[in-house]
């Protein structure tokens, strides 16, 4: 399955080749997908190539060949293209913070609440974000505070010293601000999502892992958007 950004890029390349006989430049692709850097385009093209949708023609500039297109009737793609952004989660691209209309409504029953699990969040190197509900989970109300919440499954081991393991389900309170030291869902450059501890360092923002194998990453404040903060965790044994 393609992510929304992968699908958008594939269709943009397809339309440009169909119209003009040549694939668009990286700058044109970056502008069309509203990304901040060409590195995001490189990652998307590599992902499309690995999935067999395109190939790069050697020794030629702006030379991409479309090998196949996704099934236009795919419901997941239709949903991704037809609605706004939901909370940022794995393997592909995203946009600004989710609005309440994008989340399935939480349902309360006695001392539990049913939350949408919006995919998997990278607790490792930031990876492109998906945005579709994968399933739902019942959560004890005493783990949640006020406001809106959603859940994400953890992918990676960068937060193990904070007690967050690969495969855990983290409970996120939706917000767009955080206090230095909070563990947050951070969207980097508009399309990469990660679960990290946020530190404010002067005019910069540091995203800290809780695993010495991972380096702290420093960004300008305009490059990082908070999409929620950690309020609880579920684990299966």
Swiss-Prot record:
Its EC number is 3.4.21.88. Signal peptide: none annotated. Pfam families: LexA_DNA_bind, Peptidase_S24. Residues 84-110 are annotated as: Disordered. GO terms for biological process: DNA repair; DNA replication; negative regulation of DNA-templated transcription; proteolysis; SOS response. It is an enzyme of class 3 (hydrolase). It catalyses: Hydrolysis of Ala-|-Gly bond in repressor LexA. It comes from the Bacteria. The record marks 123-124 as: Cleavage. GO terms for molecular function: DNA binding; serine-type endopeptidase activity. Keywords: Autocatalytic cleavage, DNA damage, DNA repair, DNA replication, DNA-binding, Hydrolase, Repressor, SOS response, Transcription, Transcription regulation. InterPro entries: LexA (IPR006200), LexA-like (IPR039418), LexA/Signal_pep-like_sf (IPR036286), LexA_DNA-bd_dom (IPR006199), LexA_repressor (IPR050077), Peptidase_S24_LexA (IPR006197), Peptidase_S24_S26A/B/C (IPR015927), WH-like_DNA-bd_sf (IPR036388). The keyword Metal-binding does not apply. The active site is at residues 158, 196. Residues 26-46 bind DNA. Homodimer. Belongs to the peptidase S24 family. Represses a number of genes involved in the response to DNA damage (SOS response), including recA and lexA. In the presence of single-stranded DNA, RecA interacts with LexA causing an autocatalytic cleavage which disrupts the DNA-binding part of LexA, leading to derepression of the SOS regulon and eventually DNA repair. This is LexA repressor. It comes from Parvibaculum lavamentivorans (strain DS-1 / DSM 13023 / NCIMB 13966).
């Amino acid at each position: 399955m393609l992510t929304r950004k992968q699908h958008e890029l594939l269709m943009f390349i397809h339309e440009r080749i169909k119209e003009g006989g040549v694939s668009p430049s990286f700058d044109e692709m970056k502008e069309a997908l509203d990304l901040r850097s060409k590195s995001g385009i490189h990652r998307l093209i590599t992902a499309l190539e690995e999935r067999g949708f395109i190939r790069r023609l050697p020794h030629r500039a702006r030379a991409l060949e479309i090998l196949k297109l996704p099934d236009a009737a795919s419901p997941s793609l239709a949903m991704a293209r037809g609605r706004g952004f939901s909370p940022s989660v794995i393997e592909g691209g995203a946009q600004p913070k989710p609005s309440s209309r994008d989340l399935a409504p939480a349902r309360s029953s006695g001392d539990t609440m049913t939350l949408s699990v919006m995919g998997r969040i990278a607790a490792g190197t930031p990876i492109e974000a998906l945005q579709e509900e994968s399933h739902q989970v019942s959560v004890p109300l005493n783990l949640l505070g006020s406001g809106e919440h959603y859940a994400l499954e953890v992918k990676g081991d960068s937060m193990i010293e904070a007690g967050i393991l690969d495969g855990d389900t983290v409970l996120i309170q939706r917000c767009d601000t955080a206090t230095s030291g909070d563990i947050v869902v951070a969207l980097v450059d508009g399309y990469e999502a990660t679960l990290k501890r946020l530190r404010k360092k002067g005019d910069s923002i540091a995203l800290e892992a809780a695993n010495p194998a991972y380096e702290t990453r420093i960004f300008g404040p305009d490059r990082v958007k908070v999409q929620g903060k950690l309020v609880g965790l579920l684990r299966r044994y």
